Amino acid sequence: MSITAERKKELMGEFATAKGDTGSPEVQVAILSERIKNLTDHFKDHKKDNHSRRGLLALVSQRRSLLDYLKRKDDVRYQTLIEKLGLRR
């Protein structure tokens, strides 16, 4: 259900803008996208889990806010991130 520490480190390594980067919007969006993907898979088996669905909506909203921020600050980084993650927009 949740992502492991190893998977988080992989994502940080892949999307980091500098060595040791853990808080850039790219890293945060990548980790949120992984959590969203895991929850989406969870809902295939547990269709009536509305408490988790509310959490999913919060994660999607948080990711959207970070993407809007990144687009406002640096459109090139935004476009690169969207392509890497395969998000629609």
Swiss-Prot record:
It comes from Mesorhizobium japonicum (strain LMG 29417 / CECT 9101 / MAFF 303099) (Mesorhizobium loti (strain MAFF 303099)). Keywords: Ribonucleoprotein, Ribosomal protein, RNA-binding, rRNA-binding. SUPFAM superfamilies: S15/NS1 RNA-binding domain. One of the primary rRNA binding proteins, it binds directly to 16S rRNA where it helps nucleate assembly of the platform of the 30S subunit by binding and bridging several RNA helices of the 16S rRNA. Belongs to the universal ribosomal protein uS15 family. The lineage of its organism: Bacteria, Pseudomonadati, Pseudomonadota, Alphaproteobacteria, Hyphomicrobiales. It comes from the Bacteria. GO terms for molecular function: rRNA binding; structural constituent of ribosome. GO terms for biological process: translation. Part of the 30S ribosomal subunit. Forms a bridge to the 50S subunit in the 70S ribosome, contacting the 23S rRNA. It holds the Pfam family Ribosomal_S15. This is Small ribosomal subunit protein uS15. GO terms for cellular component: cytosolic small ribosomal subunit. InterPro entries: Ribosomal_uS15 (IPR000589), Ribosomal_uS15_bac-type (IPR005290), uS15_NS1_RNA-bd_sf (IPR009068).
